[in-house]
């Protein structure tokens, strides 16, 4: 492929990402797996300034689950990851947390930034980013095939605490043909800024998952004969910390509903 053709492909991908954000700003709600292929996606959590240092330390101590791509200063809502984007409106669905409890989901978080003008926002790498390379390698991504949300599970693995924050690891799951698991691990492992290689392969009970067909977040997916469940660290882990730690106030993305950036996935390939 010539440089000119590569530039055209990148331009089309950026245009797709911007179109997606514009549609979410206009009120469209959908999981973002498979949206703007080739572009990086990010989880989001915004907390009052008083909790920002605790979370930054929590992310630093748990980089597999919480790889920070950008930190937006208190009260601001623009990011270097997407020119012209507004973090308050350009995610398809937000969750609102008060005292560690989920109180509502909203499509427009603007009033929450007005209510809490000191919110510090963290954008965290998402495994949706390496799904395009998986597909390009001929590895099926079941939730994209089925047009559903990725299944996510709370586990029995505790994250390293930091300050007032503690909680368990959350994982996403993709069923992978046994013959392709090594390939999936190698491909995803080249993207450490978006969770990297799997944290567990096989027996879900070893993670404390009693029923793999009943995810804590997202949708259940088919696991066919010859496939093995493969688990990756997940950016919903901060939401588990919000619940466990009783954080007074926080805004997050709804699981599976990410911030689609203008940054090519190749940026985070090592």
From Swiss-Prot:
Known EC number: 4.2.1.-
Keywords linked to the UniProt accession: Lyase
Pfam families assigned to the protein according to its UniProt record, in alphabetical order: D-Glu_cyclase (PF07286)
Organism superkingdom: Bacteria
Lyase found in the keyword field: yes
A molecular function GO annotation: lyase activity
InterPro entries: D-Glu_cyclase, Putative_hydro-lyase, UPF0317
Record-linked Gene3D superfamilies: PSTPO5379-like, PSTPO5379-like domain
Enzyme type, top EC level: lyase
Recorded family membership: Belongs to the D-glutamate cyclase family.
Record-linked HAMAP family: Hydro_lyase
Record-linked NCBIfam families: PRK05463.1
UniProt protein name: Putative hydro-lyase Reut_A2449
Annotated source species: Cupriavidus pinatubonensis (strain JMP 134 / LMG 1197) (Cupriavidus necator (strain JMP 134))
